[in-house]
Amino acid sequence: LEVLGSILVLQGKGSKDTTEIVVLQCAELMVRSGIAYSHKQAESLITGAITSGKALEKFKQMCILQGVEQATATTLVDNPGTVLPSSNHITDITASQSGYVSEINSMVLAEIARKHGAGRFTIEDEIVPDVGFEIVVERGEYISAGSIWLKFHHNQILTDAEIATLTSALTTSAQEIVVHSRLISVVE
């Protein structure tokens, strides 16, 4: 799912917060390496590369240079769902009440994902790459009770307790939420 998320960002279809963090990190690298003279210039170059498709093309070239066949790399960037592994089940988790998305408890999500193979309890445990989450709402967005906010990709059947726990991971507010940049400060 991480590869899919990366491809979506490069296609210009990624979540706002993931795209923001990618652009911020890339801009910092470009400024520090002398490719850009300012963060503003770097951000403009990065968003231009995403919009024009150059960033996605560079990703495809990187895959080919690492041994992926050209036809597979092309399919990966054009239609990633046909190449990437997929889980046996996708469970939609819905909001229990209406309101503005104020918080998603990532620790709750991580613990359940780990139980289903997306993480390790011991160093010997195997990670199952097709297990994970798609969060389909963003902080500050209004959601109605019963609307899907999370898709869990998994191979084992979820228990009722796990579904209830996932449902409880979303907190909403009756008041609008002010969403700030994910960047608090740059430590040099």
Language-model-derived ranges and their functions:
Residues 1-188:
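Well-ordered secondary-structure scaffolds
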